[in-house]
Every structure is written in C-alpha cells, then in structure tokens.
Swiss-Prot record:
Gene Ontology MF: a single term: structural constituent of ribosome
Gene Ontology biological process terms, A to Z: translation
Functional description taken from the UniProt entry: This protein binds specifically to 23S rRNA. The globular domain of the protein is located near the polypeptide exit tunnel on the outside of the subunit, while an extended beta-hairpin is found that lines the wall of the exit tunnel in the center of the 70S ribosome.
InterPro entries assigned to the protein according to its UniProt record, in alphabetical order: Ribosomal_uL22, Ribosomal_uL22_bac/chlpt-type, Ribosomal_uL22_bac/org-type, Ribosomal_uL22_CS, Ribosomal_uL22_sf
Domain of life from the UniProt record: Eukaryota
Keyword Ribonucleoprotein found: yes
Primary subcellular site in the record, as a coarse category: plastid
Spans traversing the lipid bilayer: none
Compartments (UniProt record): Plastid
Protein family (similarity comment): Belongs to the universal ribosomal protein uL22 family.
Name assigned to this protein: Large ribosomal subunit protein uL22c
Gene coding for it: rpl22
Keywords recorded for this protein, A-Z: Plastid, Ribonucleoprotein, Ribosomal protein, RNA-binding, rRNA-binding
Length: 135
C-alpha cells in the first residue's frame, strides 16, 4: 500500500512560558486533524495557549514544504504532545525585608505532521482510516 515509509516532520517548542495543563487543553482539540482545519480552530480559540501552538504548526508545515516539497492540503497532525519543562524560580520582595518564592511553569510542545500523499491516492478509504487512527 505504501510507496515508501511516510516521513514525519516535526516542530519543537521548548521553554514556553505556560502551564502544561493549559497547553494540553488546546492540543487535545487539534490532535489528528488536518493542517487547514487546525489553523481554523486555533485562530478562533480564545485561549492564550493557542498562539504559541499556532506558531509551531506553521513552523512544522514550513518544514514539511521545505524538506518534502509537500502540499499543505495533504498534511495532518499525526502526533501532538505537551511535556512539563523546568519551573522558572523568582523571588518576590515583600514587606519587612522578606521575600516569597514564585515558580513560573514552562512546557515543551512537540507537533508531528504526516503527509497523506505518501500513501496510495486512488483509495480514499486509506486516507480516512489514517485520519481516524490519528485521532
């Protein structure tokens, strides 16, 4: 069925200044969707986490078009994950010479794209099965 092994193109964002749980809320909405559908969802999403994820999806698509010469209409998100990063530690000055520690969470986001055109294009059921498996 396959012409060759379908390569995975990825974009990795590290040390993004937000909680991993807040980023996962957005990532769960786009996992397994096509590239164009993902852009529409992220542009209309009201969360602060949507913007850095949108930049990563753009970056992964430009990586795919540069390395594989693939069309953006054939791309879909095969894997999207969010991992915790190191906490940025600061001290906030308080009254009477005291200070309180502030821990600002960070996260690492990975977006993997696959190109559907690497599979047989004559059977549309293969493409639909790929999209269903990725979800």
């Amino acid at each position: 069925m396959r012409k060759t092994k379908a390569p995975e193109i990825y974009a990795l964002g590290q040390h993004i200044s937000m909680s991993a749980d807040k980023a996962r809320r957005v990532i769960d909405q786009i996992r397994g969707r096509s590239y164009e559908e993902t852009l529409m969802i992220l542009e209309l999403m009201p969360y602060r986490a949507a913007y850095p994820i949108l930049k990563l999806v753009y970056s992964a698509a430009s990586n795919a078009s540069y390395t594989l010469d693939s069309n953006e209409a054939n791309l879909f998100i095969s894997k999207a994950e969010v991992n915790q990063g190191p906490a940025i530690k600061k001290l906030k000055p308080r009254a009477r010479g005291r200070s309180y520690p502030i821990k600002r969470p960070t996260c690492h986001i990975t977006i993997l794209l696959k190109d559907i055109s690497f599979y047989d294009s004559d059977s549309e059921s293969v493409e639909l099965n790929l999209l269903k498996k990725a979800r």
